[in-house]
Amino acid sequence: MLSFFFLGVCEGWGDPHYITFDGLYYSYQGNCTYILMEEVTAKYHLKIYVDNVFCDPTEDVSCPRSLTIAYGFQVITLINHNLIGAPKLEALQNGERLKLPYSQQSIKVMSSGINLIYEIPRLNVVITFGMTGFAVNLPYKYFGNNTQGHCGTCTNNQADDCRLPTGELVGNCAVMADYWPANDIYQPNCPTPPVVPTNVPEPPLEPTPCTPDSSCDLLKSSVFAECHPLVSPENFYKGCVFDSCHLSNPIVECTSLQAYAAACAQAGICIHWRNHTKVCASDCPPDKVYKPCGPAEQATCEDNPNEQITTFVTEGCFCPDGMKLFNKESGICVEKCGCLDPEGIPREFNERFEYKCQDCICDEPTKTVICKPKTCPAPPTANCTAPGFIVVNQTSSVDPCCFVYVCKCQINTCPVNSMNCPVGYKPVVSVPEGKCCPEHTCEPKRVCVHKDVEYQAQFQSSCK
């Protein structure tokens, strides 16, 4: 008898490989948007679409580019904009990017840096999406015997997983998958399957000899040995071998390992596997650390102890041990809770600091930064008695937030001197160092003067 609390997991990864809710493995290379899961009888109004696109330049193999989740009146798309290298993940609603974490109308959307996590807390539904592909976790309590699509029927019976929209069963889920296009989405380039399905036996994974990459062997090695009794690695190994032999991008092989590690994590076994590979390294920002099993909803300074948080674990980039997020929006890790200043720098409670010529404090009662204009000491009065100097205030060289009084030369306030020099002399204007106003002096010219008349002096001659 199936447990009332049984959790069905449908997984898809690589190019892509599927494991249905009931554990049936198959591969499918469709290049359209399909119904991944829908309710046979609408009870909770949950429907999930998967958009598969060709993702290799040398082979017609496809990868899951996005999941679109329709729940009630909300439609949210989890998308990976980069299928070749490091994932570039976004959550969209009505074409607009969601600021994560998002929590509204009974759903949550979070990011671990490596995966996006979509949760419906009241139904215990958790959906993850990332470079690895996706995993849809549904409780049998709400969805048992009431699902159809690429993920199968959630009946704990693999024999009825390959069901067509008509209810007819076929023996090959890769054939079945053709019949689940998202008809309510305009897709002019999607092929129309034949009216009567043909049960073509699945071809062997590799018709010609192929040596898979050594990364695939890790799945059956001691690295994952602790998980083997709980989750079989066989389907993930088959997917890894197929990807290794068909795709030119070696990073895709990582998806099988990542998908298996995620399945192990949900079974309670955390595997540190990435450091055993050459091409599956994690990439976290400098202020975060990689963890193979961390909380999908990370602890913050703003957590309400009475509020239920997600217990789902995922790999990703997390705050170092002993630190937590300041809040859900900032993404900043702190050792002690306090305030964020206007520049986003964490401040401890009662810490005083200066910001843009304001004296600020991280106020503990309000948990906010309170600022007031900085109080400057009264500057000494400048004694400007010399001609031309006036008193002005200017920014202090010691403290740019305060001002001082200085004597500044204002030449247009200087007295006007009309100086007449005697015959044979010329007026010379200069401003002595330390003074403002020009001073006039009379200097002799190189001329001869006779009866108040100037004469040009001749070389080696004398004036008589």
Model regions: which residues?
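Extracellular/secreted glycoprotein ectodomains characterized by long, lumenal stretches
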Residues: 1-464
